[in-house]
């Protein structure tokens, strides 16, 4: 049976309700000096949790768990076991141990009638499956169970928290409108004062921001970040905001506020490393992304090493490899990331697919790039937010450019520019303008290409994105004088020929372009400058041409092409 409340325990409970964490800790300490009870240990653990005193959190909760078991109170033991599951995940980064505690709680509750502890377990396990394993389908099942039980037993806080997990799971799976409606409802209940549990209130806001970031709905995210920051300051919820501010930094990064992003990430990293070291990886990965965009590739690599092997770190390494012209490494790392993300987790797959399309295009893996692009385009259609549609258009344009479909590339990349502008993403706008300029140059529209390169360079310079600025400048410098050509001929100066001969030997339009320039005597470096491709990509195209023509040298490829009428 629960022990009766002493004056010190009553004072501790009152202090917890007011967010007076140190006062609560002192009150529960005083109560425990008289007699050790699981209830007082629970209160002490919660105060220590908000104060980021990890050792005291674990010690108090594990003692409370043992006392509840010894007193034949399975519901109390299960409640604490759920908390311990969260603690082992958040403080120590041990998901296997965390899952063990969650399953122990489930075993303790299997013979119990519907109760608040069962709702708490379902909601927390659902969030664990979503945030740790990226599984929105199983998370939805558990969230629905938790909502039903919480409603039946009249626990509004757990019901709303369950709806928040449900909303985030729906957004993650691509049902953005439905998921956001649910999250809006939960946070309206928060604003209206329907919730009293500070943990449920804080997590509901965090899940809203997380959902906004996943679909890049940054206008909505800014509003909720501002509200959460004020709420955290009022109640002294520093650890809660330290986690969520890393997501706020992504908003700053997306919108071009790189100085603010850096300040937020440095502050979050320092706070988390002192109290929740297992959760610093996310902040380190985001800081690495900032460094990568700034062109500080060595610094980015060092930060990613510190971040370990979490999913976003894999994606960061893939992007870094791509920037270093290691398309094979980029493709492999991105594919590794995607193997960890279930297909139902559409929003988290999108970024990996975008990179796979670009890397495989550079490797001349036409089928692989096409498959990845089809999935990315499908996700963009389902999610339907402007940033994801922009990403799909950008990837489609990049792939078309790699295949020599220059006019199709132009159209896709124009759409990408427009959508990124609409989304308020200057770095992405500049990247899209760079690729659009390459497409225009391939069409020999050199004046228009130069203008797009200059616009991209101006944006990169404003952002201080040195690596991308230098790349765009190299492309601009490689443009021939405007009067060198303005007709509809190919970059080799030859008219387009009938595709029948090329199709018979399996050559793509891009490979025909490369072959004609090889015949004209251009080196791989000169070819890359003419076609605005990396030297590595040119090498892959030449290797594919020789393979398809069944020859072993460039000279033999040119001779075979002449016999087939491909150079006419």
Residues covered by each model-derived region:
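Residue signature of alpha-solenoid helical repeat architecture, marking inter-repeat boundaries
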Residues: 2, 35-38, 42, 71, ...
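Amphipathic alpha-helical segments of tetratricopeptide repeats
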Residues: 25-33, 62-73, 86, 102-110, ...
């Amino acid at each position: 049976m629960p022990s009766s409340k002493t004056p010190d325990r009553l004072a501790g409970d009152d202090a917890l309700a007011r967010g007076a964490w140190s006062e609560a800790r002192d009150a529960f300490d005083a109560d425990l000096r008289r007699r050790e009870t699981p209830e007082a240990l629970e209160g002490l653990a919660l105060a220590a949790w908000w104060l980021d005193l990890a050792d005291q959190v674990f010690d108090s909760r594990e003692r409370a768990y043992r006392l509840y078991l010894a007193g034949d109170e399975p519901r109390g033991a299960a409640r604490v076991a759920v908390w311990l599951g969260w603690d082992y995940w958040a403080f120590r980064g041990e998901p296997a141990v965390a899952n063990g505690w969650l399953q122990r709680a489930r075993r303790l509750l299997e013979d119990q009638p519907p109760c608040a502890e069962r709702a708490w377990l379902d909601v927390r396990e659902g969030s664990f499956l979503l945030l740790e394993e990226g599984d929105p389908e199983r998370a939805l099942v558990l969230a629905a169970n938790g909502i039903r039980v919480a409603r039946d037993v009249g626990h509004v806080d757990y019901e709303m928290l369950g709806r928040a997990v449900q909303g985030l799971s729906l957004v993650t799976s691509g049902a953005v409108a439905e998921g956001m409606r649910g999250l809006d409802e939960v946070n309206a209940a928060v604003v209206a004062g329907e919730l009293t549990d500070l943990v449920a209130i804080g997590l509901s806001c965090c899940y809203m921001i997380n959902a906004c970031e996943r679909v890049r709905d940054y206008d909505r995210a800014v509003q909720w970040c501002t509200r959460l920051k004020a709420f955290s300051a009022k109640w002294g919820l520093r650890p809660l905001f330290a986690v969520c501010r890393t997501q706020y930094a992504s908003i700053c990064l997306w919108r071009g506020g790189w100085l603010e992003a850096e300040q937020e990430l440095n502050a979050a990293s320092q706070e988390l490393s002192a109290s929740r070291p297992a959760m610093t990886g996310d902040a380190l990965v985001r800081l690495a992304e900032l460094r990568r965009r700034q062109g500080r590739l060595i610094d980015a690599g060092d930060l990613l090493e510190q971040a370990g092997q979490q999913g976003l770190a894999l994606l960061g390494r893939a992007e870094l490899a791509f920037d270093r012209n290691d398309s094979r490494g980029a493709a492999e790392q991105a594919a590794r990331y995607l193997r960890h993300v279930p297909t139902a987790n559409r929003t988290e797959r999108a970024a990996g697919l975008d990179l796979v399309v670009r890397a495989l295009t550079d490797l001349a893996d036409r089928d692989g790039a096409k498959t990845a692009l089809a999935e990315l385009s499908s996700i963009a259609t389902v999610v339907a937010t402007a940033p994801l549609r922009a990403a799909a258009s950008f990837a489609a344009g990049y792939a078309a450019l790699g295949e020599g479909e220059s006019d199709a590339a132009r159209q896709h990349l124009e759409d990408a520019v427009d959508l990124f502008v609409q989304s308020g993403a200057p770095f992405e706008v500049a990247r899209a303008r760079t690729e659009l300029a390459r497409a225009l140059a391939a069409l020999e529209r050199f004046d228009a290409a130069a203008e797009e390169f200059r616009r991209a360079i101006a944006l990169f310079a404003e952002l201080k994105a040195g690596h991308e600025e230098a790349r765009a400048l190299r492309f601009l410098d490689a443009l021939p004088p405007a009067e060198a050509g303005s007709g509809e001929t190919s970059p080799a100066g030859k008219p387009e020929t009938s595709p029948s001969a090329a199709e018979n030997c399996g050559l793509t339009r891009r490979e025909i372009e490369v072959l004609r320039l090889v015949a004209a005597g251009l080196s791989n470096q000169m070819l890359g400058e003419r076609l605005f491709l990396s030297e590595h990509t040119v090498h892959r195209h030449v290797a594919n041409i020789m393979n398809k023509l069944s020859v072993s040298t460039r000279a033999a490829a040119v001779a075979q092409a002449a016999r087939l009428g491909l150079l006419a």
